[in-house]
Regions:
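Bacterial Sec-dependent N-terminal signal peptides
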Residues: 1-29
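A sequence-level/structural motif corresponding to short, flexible coil/turn segments enriched
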Residues: 24-232
Length: 232
């Protein structure tokens, strides 16, 4: 009888160990240690579906984008030609990502505004193909945040110079082609790097305009679907 009890204890003990090993094997994270570029400084990292990761790096003055798989393998890596700053990297649906920042305007032919440096928003898919490429804002403007709406339009915010050494915060809505639907400028602020899209049936934007220079103000503005301040 005593031997039977001992055997039962041993069996339960072994079953417990096996169960623990199965749990550990099931949830064991994939760890890798790899090098991406010789002098590549990683600026932004964005976790993606399927344990994949998108990274923005900078070598010298040039930016690059690398999309890596679950085990650290490079799915694609490409230079972000024209970009002078990349301020945000966001995951979108359908294995896409959104980049916003500042860029030299790559093709100025046919443009009437003579803008050579402006804000830029780019959407890429998992193969590295550019789905959307939009230049937005006046000369010297810079985008700091972006959001893709269900309609395919984009909400973009950032800053633009307004004469001398001063600047102002901007927020705009553009369609898929880059056409400006509306643009709101907050003259007392320095930039806008935070906003949220609100409303289920009617679109509202709650945006924070900030400033870190002398005489720049910090304000929170709520905009309606036409880009006008909305007062409750």
């Amino acid at each position: 009888m005593k031997k039977t009890r001992i055997h039962r204890v041993w069996i339960l003990f072994l079953l417990g160990i096996m169960a623990c090993l199965q749990v550990r094997a099931q949830y064991m994270p994939v760890v890798f240690d790899k090098k991406y570029g010789d002098k590549n400084q990683i600026q932004l990292v964005c976790p993606l579906a399927g344990d994949e990761v998108a990274m923005v790096g900078k070598e010298g003055q040039k930016y690059n984008l690398t999309w890596i798989g679950r085990e650290g393998e490079v799915l694609f890596s490409l230079p972000l030609a024209g970009f002078t700053a990349v301020n945000e990297l966001t995951e979108l649906e359908d294995n896409r990502i959104l980049l916003v920042g500042q860029s030299a305007v790559m093709n100025t032919k046919g443009r009437k505004d003579n803008v050579t440096l402006s804000g830029r928003a780019v959407i890429l898919d998992r193969s590295g193909h550019i789905v959307t490429n939009i230049y937005a804002g006046g000369q010297g403007s810079e985008l700091m945040k972006g959001a893709l709406l269900r309609s395919g339009s984009l909400i973009l915010s950032g800053m633009e110079p307004k004469g001398g050494n001063s600047r102002q915060g901007i927020l705009m809505k553009v369609d898929k082609s880059g056409r400006v639907i509306y643009q709101y400028k907050n003259a007392g602020s320095g930039y806008c790097d935070q906003f949220e899209v609100l409303g289920n049936t009617t679109e509202y934007i709650c945006a924070a305009f900030s400033g870190d220079k002398e005489k720049e103000q910090t304000t929170v503005v709520r905009l309606d679907d036409k880009g006008k301040p909305y007062y409750v």
